[in-house]
Curated annotation (Swiss-Prot):
Chain ranges on the Extracellular side, renumbered to this chain: 32-225
Signal peptide boundaries: 1-31
Cellular component terms (Gene Ontology): MHC class II protein complex
PTM notes: Ubiquitinated in immature dendritic cells leading to down-regulation of MHC class II.
Record-given protein name: H-2 class II histocompatibility antigen, I-E beta chain
Length: 264
């Protein structure tokens, strides 16, 4: 088995040379290809009070051996990893280096990124909407969209008429945006009744108080009346704007006329 060092630049060079080797570089090579790689993970609990280091070795998408700092030695996950685990555990220098990684790798990097990542806070944007525009008293799915927030620990709860809903809730889980922010959708399956008020409440470290967004269940006639009122208001604003435009244009035209007099 090939052992990849934890030093990023060295590991990158080894992988690059592997990719560029002649057997793999052939475009029409029909031979089976095999992939081996390792991952190094640092898990922090309450800052650096408790740190766990995991080093996993994967061959063809299957983990075969790992080092767990909570265990203190290499353990085979499958029979394929047993020879490696036995060999590495028999080498004092390798084992000592792996055990020290909690401090030399995890805590060291935590201190470097502490000033940027730990205090960073981005407030979420919260919107609520139904998935279907259909009459009341029919099955519907209310969506609470929470986007562009950091860090990822967030709590989203649904309320109906002030009472928390515990059932019928579906979540997408955290989705990474790729720009150090997250998003999630928390949906409530329900049959809205006229007059009911649904509230999505979001709690996040960036917020001093929870954010709440309401959605009111309205009948079709009530929605039509509201839309008619909004449409009439907008139409009135358009007529008012047109009237003011014509008025000021006429005023400007009159002020531009010069008085006529007799020529001597």
């Amino acid at each position: 088995m090939v052992w990849l060092p934890r030093v990023p630049c060295v590991a990158a060079v080894i992988l690059l040379l592997t990719v560029l080797s002649p057997p793999v570089a052939l475009v029409r090579n029909s031979r089976p290809r095999f992939l081996e790689y390792s991952t190094s993970e640092c898990h922090f609990y309450n800052g650096t009070q408790r740190v766990r280091f995991l080093e996993r070795y994967i061959y063809n998408r299957e983990e075969y051996v790992r080092f767990d700092s909570d265990v203190g030695e290499y353990r085979a996950v499958t029979e394929l990893g047993r020879p490696d685990a036995e060999y590495w555990n028999s080498q004092p220098e390798i084992l000592e280096d792996a055990r020290a990684t909690v401090d030399t790798y995890c805590r060291h990097n935590y201190e470097i990124f502490d000033n940027f990542l730990v205090p960073r806070r981005v407030e979420p944007t919260v919107t609520v909407y139904p998935t279907k525009t259909q009459p009341l008293e029919h099955h519907n799915l209310l969506v609470c969209s929470v986007s562009d927030f950091y860090p990822g620990n967030i709590e989203v709860r649904w309320f109906r008429n002030g009472k928390e809903e515990k059932t019928g809730i579906v979540s997408t889980g955290l989705v990474r945006n790729g720009d150090w922010t997250f998003q999630t959708l928390v949906m409530l399956e329900t049959v809205p009744q006229s007059g009911e008020v649904y509230t999505c409440q979001v709690e996040h470290p960036s917020l001093t108080d929870p954010v709440t967004v309401e959605w009111k269940a309205q009948s079709t006639s009530a929605q039509n009346k509201m839309l008619s009122g909004v449409g009439g208001f907008v139409l009135g604003l358009l007529f008012l704007g047109a009237g003011l435009f014509i008025y000021f244009r006429n005023q400007k035209g009159q002020s531009g006329l010069q008085p006529t007099g007799l020529l001597s």
